[in-house]
């Protein structure tokens, strides 16, 4: 649509992967929820687009997350998970799209 001003904030809260081989750097995981809520609340207050973006950037700079799983997921269209987790292990730092983590712990 023409005439609609937009801005973009790339959320990068995942502390497990500072330079992911699957992306251009830190990825957004659970922290995206808080950035969305803060930006939405600011917009609901009637803030300008620039003020909404600034609030989202401040939140993004201060939110950190790390993933943990006891099982791997199977992505749609695939027959098996991208990694496995034994019954006595947990996977730390995996991605939300099935990317393997950085460490397994017993």
Predicted regions mapped to residue ranges:
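Active-site histidine-anchored catalytic micro-motif
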Residues: 1, 5-53, 58-65
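Mixed-charge interfacial surface used for oligomerization/domain docking
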Residues: 17, 43-106
């Amino acid at each position: 649509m023409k005439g609609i001003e937009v801005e973009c904030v790339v959320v990068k809260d995942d502390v497990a992967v500072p330079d992911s081989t699957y992306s251009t750097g830190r990825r957004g995981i659970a922290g995206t929820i808080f950035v969305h809520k803060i930006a939405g609340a600011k917009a609901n207050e009637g803030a300008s687009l620039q003020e909404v973006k600034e609030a989202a950037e401040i939140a993004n700079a201060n939110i950190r997350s790390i993933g943990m799983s006891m099982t791997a997921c199977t992505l749609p269209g695939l027959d098996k998970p991208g990694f496995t987790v034994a019954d006595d292990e947990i996977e730390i730092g995996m991605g939300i799209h099935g990317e393997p983590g950085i460490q397994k712990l017993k």
